[in-house]
Amino acid sequence: MKDIYISKDKKSSDDFDVVYLDDTAPLPPLDEPPQEPQFEPEQPERPQKVKKAKKHRKHRFLRFVAAFIAVIIVLTSSFIYLFAAVSGYNKENLEANQYISSSELTSSSMVTNILLMGVDGSSKTSQRSDSMILVSIDMAHRKIKLTSFLRDSWVTIPSKDKMAKLNAAYSYGGAQLAVDTLEYNFGVDIDHFAAVDFDMFSQIIDKLGGVDVEVTEKEAKFINRTTRYTVESGESVHLDGAKALVYCRIRKLDTDYMRTYRQRKVITALINKAKRTPLTKLIAIMRDIFPLITTDLSPLEITGLAYKGGMSMLLFDIEQTRVPLEDQCDAGMHNGQWTEELDFDAVRRYLHDFIYTDKIDVSDK
């Protein structure tokens, strides 16, 4: 059999292909079947692939946009609902401290300090801040820090230019003077305050469903003996608002250090309770709680603070301490009153390190 060759040498477009026979080409063996012609599979056109990829990317982008819009709608509706929830409260403005310049106060853009005050007394002229706890929201170290100030601390009341117990500042000039006095004596910038009457405090705890705290046998016996309430001892004892208030106000059992410690335990329990509460339920509770509170925060500021770190703050660790510590003061009688005379330099350094630089180990404080 002769091979056939087709010549492609055309002299013009009208020429036909010239076919040649090759007499020297070897013949295939007779016992081998003729081989099928080999064809390379056709490759799909590249433009179609690109078109499909673009189509998939477009669908993914549309899904992303739809999800983003849904999130915006949810956040916006939550923002409006939260704004409405915190609108019915007692607003009281907080002016700049006129007794000390802001440059003399320690502050940080990553820390928000809110002074919580438990006010004791039915008459405004006789009210004293029986409990003062500075809540420091530390975004840099992802912590919520609670600092109790002992009410018997002997401090300068700047508006009176005289020394007195710390808890007297509120009776002299309300929340404004209480904040000014703390800043003046301790050098820490306080951004906001929230005050609640102790009678209201028990209602707040009830609206949150009570708290679980450790109650020692000594504390339980004292409450059972001196009040009309019955409380058991244990590592996790459930207290309603009335019992929690009695627990916070134990005074004659031990020291003021322990009294403030019990108050911080209840505040910590409230925060932990909030962590386990669904957001929608928490907002509904806030609607009931805020009318019981007096604060300088506007509804917009409260809502902004909640959305600035509200979700992440539920994961923050909680640390607590008090000032002064035992080695930062001398306790004794002063002008017929039991007072704590402070080493202010030591206290200021301690507060700075605890609140701002996170250098203090408070496990044993």
How should each PLM-predicted stretch be described?
Residues 2-365:
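Non-catalytic, solvent-exposed segments at the cell envelope interface
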